[in-house]
């Protein structure tokens, strides 16, 4: 697809990104930077939603590796995403951008329960919608949650914000000769075992015809550049014959 034609976009952001240069928690300077990037994106007349991770506070899979039951560990990870979502909502609101948090785990005194119809209504009215608590179920990644929410809100595009400017055949940080892909098909991602998103997330997007863009959130202006159709991301979609 022509990415520049996308009008409803879901942005998946890892919790680790919120740490900035810190070893833990939320870096105020990165939060301010993220707000600026989001505001620049919605200035393009984009309807924007986010799915945010919680790895800067707690990773369920790490807790499980340390002997904690996986279900309980994943539930703790879901709660970490709620903290991040509320922090981002507050930062956006303080900067004059309306934002709503919707959670997969009901906590009515903290956030709205997830509802795809109300989420789409909020977005049409110019509000940023932040989805937290993953899918609400253990054993599912936030990548899968992002793909699921993208399907539910009928997004035109799913953007995954990462540390690098696209998808490579190996880690470009460790391998300076790593090859960057401009475009890929869902099938190529799966068969090449490229560590972009988990298989469930890729399959959901493929079955529902939602292109995926992978870009660097740490490059200022990259988000808006991608939304304008500039080659700042690797685009994953089915190729037209």
Swiss-Prot record:
Pathway: Pyrimidine metabolism; CTP biosynthesis via de novo pathway; UDP from UMP (UMPK route): step 1/1. GO terms for cellular component: cytoplasm. It catalyses: UMP + ATP = UDP + ADP. GO terms for biological process: 'de novo' CTP biosynthetic process; UDP biosynthetic process. It comes from the Bacteria. Keywords: ATP-binding, Cytoplasm, Kinase, Nucleotide-binding, Pyrimidine biosynthesis, Transferase. It is an enzyme of class 2 (transferase). Its EC number is 2.7.4.22. Inhibited by UTP. It is found in: Cytoplasm. UMP binds at residues 54, 74, 135-142. Homohexamer. Catalyzes the reversible phosphorylation of UMP to UDP. This is Uridylate kinase. It comes from Magnetococcus marinus (strain ATCC BAA-1437 / JCM 17883 / MC-1). The lineage of its organism: Bacteria, Pseudomonadati, Pseudomonadota, Alphaproteobacteria, Magnetococcales.
């Amino acid at each position: 697809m022509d990415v520049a034609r996308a009008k409803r976009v879901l942005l998946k952001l890892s919790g680790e990104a919120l740490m900035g240069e810190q070893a833990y928690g939320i870096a105020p300077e990165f939060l301010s930077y993220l707000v600026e990037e989001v505001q620049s994106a919605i200035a393009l007349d984009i309807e924007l939603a986010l799915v945010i991770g919680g790895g800067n506070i707690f990773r369920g899979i790490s807790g499980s590796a340390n002997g904690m039951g996986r279900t309980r560990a994943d539930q703790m990870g879901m709660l970490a995403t709620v903290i991040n979502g509320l922090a981002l909502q507050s930062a956006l609101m303080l900067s004059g951008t309306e934002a709503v948090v919707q959670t997969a785990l009901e906590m009515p005194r903290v956030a709205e329960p997830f509802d795809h119809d109300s989420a789409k209504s909020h977005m049409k009215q110019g509000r940023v919608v932040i989805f937290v608590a993953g899918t609400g179920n253990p054993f599912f990644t936030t990548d899968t949650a992002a793909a699921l929410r993208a399907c539910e809100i009928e997004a035109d595009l799913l953007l995954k914000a990462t540390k690098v400017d696209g998808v490579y055949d190996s880690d470009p940080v460790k391998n300076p000769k790593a090859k960057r892909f401009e475009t890929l098909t869902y099938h190529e991602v799966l068969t090449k075992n490229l560590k972009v998103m988990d298989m469930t997330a890729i399959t959901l997007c493929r079955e529902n015809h939602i292109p995926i863009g992978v870009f660097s959130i740490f490059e200022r202006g990259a988000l808006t550049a991608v939304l304008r159709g500039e080659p700042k991301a690797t685009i994953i979609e089915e190729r037209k014959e």
